[in-house]
Amino acid sequence: MHLLITGADSLLARTLIAALPADVTVRAVDAAFSTPLPSAETRTGHLCDTAFLAAILADITHIIHLAPLYTRLADDNASLDEATRGSYQLANAAAAAGVQRLLLGSTLDFFAPLWEHFRADESWRPRPQPVLDQLCPWLAEVALREVARVTNLTTLCLRLGEVVDDAHAASHAYDRRWLHVKDGVAALLRGLEVEAEGWRVWHIGAAGERTRVPVAQAGEEAFGYRPRHDFAGRWASEAATSPFQLPTPIPARPIRKVVVFGAGGPLGAALAEELAPHYTVRLTDVKPVEELMAIPPQSPGAPLPVPPQSPHEWRVVDVRDAAQVHAACAGMDAIVNVSVVRHDPVDAFRVNAVGAYNVMQAAVAHGIQRVVHTGPFMLGQRGGAGYDWDTFLVDDIPPRPGVWWVYLPSKLLGQEICRI
């Protein structure tokens, strides 16, 4: 077995590498390493770099992808880009290279809204919260699930508790989310060898009656996970915790001022004309309106933007820039985001997914309740991975974006960000 491990500077990865059989060769990858890993070949770089990706996949047969769970970069945008575009590129390249299996490390924290009252197992729908440590693994799950659906790359998602070792457990108050690192390693080793195909999800919790998410389907014969650590010696140290609470809803207010992102496209141009008689409109795009007016229409008869007249205004705003988006939303009552990149494999994710994150962050920061986010029809995927075989398609069935056009999966990730 030739194993690639991303997020390899983590406690879980380091403990796994030490436990692997001698006949397994390991290539450990992360943005940086805090200390050397003498028992593995180490590479530093980013999964968004396609040249780096091609190099680290050479001769690899299996992948354990822990980067969305552990790797954080200079800012939120870079971390999200690595978790979304990086995971998407990794899975596609792995499928093309003939990798036999990919394991994704994710988190059981998705079920925090439920675990006070319910025993959530693998059949329950996750409830991720809008924080980076949940968005990154959740969006990686979404990206890899769609790649697995189309390419048949065997992909196992292991949602883990909070991985700790003996030293951490001895020096901290007991937390019911804990998962002993040795049990996490045992689950990963099991994931490398069990019979599986397509996309599968397993919940990897601790042993004992106190754990937040008890072992369910992962403990059945098909996967055979048997945790050994219940932290019983630390139960008495458990501190009181507040029950999960949803954020306070943003109150509604009259909508008089509207900011539009992506106003230079045909949809944005038509929208500006419709909004102008009724609202004060701030139109934004990545280029000045005069420059966009000089570009031929996207199709015959498609509308072009025109310079707005007072009290309306045009601002040059790049949705990839969180500070610019935040400033553009100041004083606004509603947001319409029609920004889009359809073909560029880099900016499709940076605009359609990370840009959506910037817009929603700005909406929350400014107390804007109404956000309109546009996206494509995602139900026309051809072949067995889509709904090509059916004729009765309703609006709320799960999307099937495929993987051949970056426009669709990147927009799906943006929609997930907005939903969360």
What are these regions (language model features)?
Residues 1-22, 250-278:
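N-terminal Rossmann NAD(P)H-binding glycine-rich loop of SDR-like oxidoreductase domains
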Residues 24-35, 279-291:
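Conserved glycine-rich Rossmann-like NAD(P)H-binding loop of the short-chain dehydrogenase/reductase
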Residues 48, 78-89, 97, 131, ...:
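Glycine-rich NAD(P)-binding loop of the Rossmann-fold in SDR/ketoreductase-type enzymes
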Residues 160-167, 178-201, 419-420:
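Alpha-helical substrate-binding/gating segment
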